[in-house]
Amino acid sequence: MRYNVIVKKITYFKGEGVFEMSRFTLPRDIYHGKGCLEELKNLKGKKAILVVGGGSMKRQGFLDRAENYLKEAGMEVKLFEGVEPDPSVETVMKGATVMQEFQPDWIVAMGGGSPIDAAKAMWAFYEYPDVTFEDLCIPFNFPELRTKAKFAAIPSTSGTATEVTAFSVITNYQ
């Protein structure tokens, strides 16, 4: 069973018998191009958790650079590594537990869609530990995030644009 987790409210309008998106609001900054990773050192906070997948970010040196930039910003940094492709409920809940213990101000997801999807769901459970996956699947029924932590996504692939959407695809393998 897959959960399509909704972590933020999205507004859309339906046209004359045809689904049309008449407005797309993106109230956050998007940095791109050479040097954009360096913007991490401008984040304000005390603690950041870096959520990554299978190791390509580490092998290519991006994980070390991101960690160093966050430390330059004066933050204590914790790594959550090993998010699998098609992230599981178990991985999300494990990450949420780590976040509850560490209490980050920033959640930084790096990699493809899987670590970003997982980190967004972890963020929801970090901010609202009593919520269930079933609660998160109800459209337009989730409280605002950003009360405990802010979220940054660093995508390494092009795909579903999870870095700019309010959705996560999480798989229940049970």
Segments the model singles out, each with a brief description of its role:
Residues 96, 115-128, 164-165:
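Short Gly/Thr/Asp-enriched flexible loops that form oxyanion-binding sites at enzyme active sites
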Residues 28, 128-174:
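A glycine/threonine-rich phosphate-anchoring loop and its flanking beta-alpha core
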Residues 78, 108, 150-154:
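Hydrophobic/aromatic beta-strand patches that form the interior of the parallel beta-sheet core
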Residues 66-69, 124-126, 169-170:
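Glycine-rich, phosphate-binding/catalytic loops in enzymes
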Residues 104-120, 156-162:
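Glycine/serine-rich anion-binding loops at beta->alpha junctions
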Residues 97-114, 142-147:
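Short, charge-rich binding segments
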Residues 5-106:
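ATP/NTP phosphate-donor binding region
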